Structure formats: C-alpha cells, structure tokens
C-alpha cells in the first residue's frame, strides 16, 4: 500500500510551470514512470499564454504515485515544480473560461476600488497640503510684521516675545485708563485744598516781594549816606553862595504870583 492516500482519479496537478513549457516536455519527463493518457497545459483565454500550472493523467494510479514521489520539488524547464493529486475531474474549456471571467471581473473590480481609494487619499492629502500652505501664506501676508514700512530688516520675534509685548501693551493701557478714571473721580474737597495751597503760596510770594523792596530801599538810603560821607568837605564860601542862590530862587517864586495879580 502506498504512503499517499488514493484519490478518486489518476491525474496529477503540477504547479510553478514555466511559461515556455510545452505539453511534449511534460510528457517526456512524466512518461518515464508509466503510460500517460493526457497532458493539459491551460492557457489564458484572452492572452493565450500559459497560466503557470498543468495536469498530467496516468493510466495507473501506482504510476502517478511514483511520478509524484520522484518529481516533486524537482527542476524542470528552469522551474522547481510542485506536484499533488488533482481534486475533481478535468474541467472543460468553457468551464475554464467562465472561471477566468469571474476571476478577471473580481480582480478588475478590486483593482478599480483600490485605485479609487488611492486617488481619494492622494486628493485629500493634496487638499490638506494646499489648505496648510494657504493658511501659512494668509498669516504671513496679514501679519503685523508685513504691515510695517520696509526698511532695515528687523529680527524676528518668537511667539513668547510677541505674547510678552502684547501683555505689556495691555497693562500699559489698563494703567492709563485707571489713572484717567481716578483723576476724573477726585472729590471736590481735594480741589478746594489745592486752591487753598495755591492762594497761600501766592501770599507768601507777595510777602517776600515786599520785604525785598524794603531791603532794597534801606540799602539805597545807606548807599546815599555813605556816598555823602565820602564826598570832600565844602568850603564856607561855597555853602554861603549856595544858600543865597536858594533864597533868591524862593523869593522870586513868591513874588511872581503877586506881580501877576497887579
């Protein structure tokens, strides 16, 4: 009894057959182990090229077993073939055509779906990259840096520096608004106190001006006295002549209105 299970038929299924392998080549190799009924190499219905496998049918099952035992994993026509017993009867050309059509339809449908999926993913990636580039360009064109007048190149600030700058501006504006509100909300008492302090300072300045004028007058009188002291002493004749001239001028002034009355 053979170590292989006896199949219902005497056909061997041969895989990994070379494309240029002919039925005569397989018949020559397998015919060494017994008489062969048929050798069938299926061809593609549309391309008319070998499909990569073949069927070899023996007359006796024992010859098929010997061929399987000796030729499995052997090199034939440049390929390492694999052999096992075929399951079921040999299919007719019409059955093979229908099977090929189903496989072609399913494969083409799968390929179409795969292409559609890939194209959608690529288009989505393109849209995403375009939207990113648009957002980047929009931010660059409408950023406050570009609104400044062109001149010397400024050093680019980082995000943290910009945040600090904004925070400083906000705090400065808040302090301004608080100072304005405080100045507006000052009570009337403070205004009165300010006016009183101003009047007091004004009176002080007046007092100081009076004292300055007095001191100036005193200093002037002292200066006159000192200048008189420094003058040389006059002679008696000069003083007498001056007194006489003064008395004459006085008498003339008194006589002038009387003469006008006459």
Swiss-Prot record:
Keywords: Cytoplasm, mRNA processing, mRNA splicing, Nucleus, Phosphoprotein, RNA-binding
A matching Pfam family: RRM_1
GO cellular component, one term: dendrite
Signal peptide extent: none
The protein's name: Serine/arginine-rich splicing factor 10
Organism: Homo sapiens
Residues the record lists as Phosphoserine modifications: 23, 106, 108, 129, 131, 133, 158, 160
Domain RRM residues, every copy: 10-88
MF (Gene Ontology): RNA binding; RS domain binding; unfolded protein binding
Expressing tissues: Widely expressed.
Region annotation Disordered: where it falls in the sequence: 116-262
Modification comment: Phosphorylated. Fully dephosphorylated in mitosis and partially dephosphorylated on heat shock.
Function: Splicing factor that in its dephosphorylated form acts as a general repressor of pre-mRNA splicing. Seems to interfere with the U1 snRNP 5'-splice recognition of SNRNP70. Required for splicing repression in M-phase cells and after heat shock. Also acts as a splicing factor that specifically promotes exon skipping during alternative splicing.
Residue spans of biased composition, Low complexity class: 134-150, 252-262
Protein family (similarity comment): Belongs to the splicing factor SR family.
Subcellular location field: Nucleus speckle; Cytoplasm
Compositionally biased intervals (Basic residues): 165-186, 194-207
Quaternary structure, from the entry: The phosphorylated but not the dephosphorylated form interacts with TRA2B/SFRS10. The dephosphorylated form interacts with SNRNP70. Isoform 1 interacts with FUS C-terminus. Isoform 3 interacts with FUS C-terminus. Interacts with YTHDC1, leading to inhibit RNA-binding activity of SRSF10.
């Amino acid at each position: 009894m053979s170590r292989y299970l006896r199949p219902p038929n005497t056909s061997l299924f041969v895989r990994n057959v070379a494309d240029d392998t002919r039925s005569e080549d397989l018949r020559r190799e397998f015919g060494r182990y017994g008489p062969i009924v048929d050798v069938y190499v299926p061809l593609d219905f549309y391309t008319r090229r070998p499909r990569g496998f073949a069927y070899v049918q023996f007359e006796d099952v024992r010859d098929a077993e010997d061929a399987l035992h000796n030729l499995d994993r052997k090199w034939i026509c440049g390929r390492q073939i694999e052999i096992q017993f075929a399951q079921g009867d040999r299919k007719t050309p019409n059955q093979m055509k229908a099977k090929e059509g189903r496989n072609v339809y399913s494969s083409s449908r799968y390929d179409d779906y795969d292409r559609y999926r890939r194209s959608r993913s690529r288009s989505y990636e393109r849209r995403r990259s375009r939207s990113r580039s648009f957002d980047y360009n929009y931010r660059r064109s409408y950023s406050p840096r570009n609104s400044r007048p062109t001149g010397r190149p400024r050093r680019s600030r980082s995000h943290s520096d910009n945040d600090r700058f904004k925070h400083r501006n906000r705090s400065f504006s808040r302090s301004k608004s608080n100072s304005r509100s405080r100045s507006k909300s000052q009570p009337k008492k403070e205004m009165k106190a300010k006016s009183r302090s101003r009047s007091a300072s004004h009176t002080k300045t007046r007092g100081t001006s009076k004292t300055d004028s007095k001191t100036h007058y005193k200093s002037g009188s002292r200066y006159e006295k000192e200048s008189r002291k420094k003058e040389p002493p006059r002679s008696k004749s000069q003083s007498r002549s001056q007194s006489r001239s003064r008395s004459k001028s006085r008498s003339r002034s008194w006589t002038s209105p009387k003469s006008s009355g006459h």
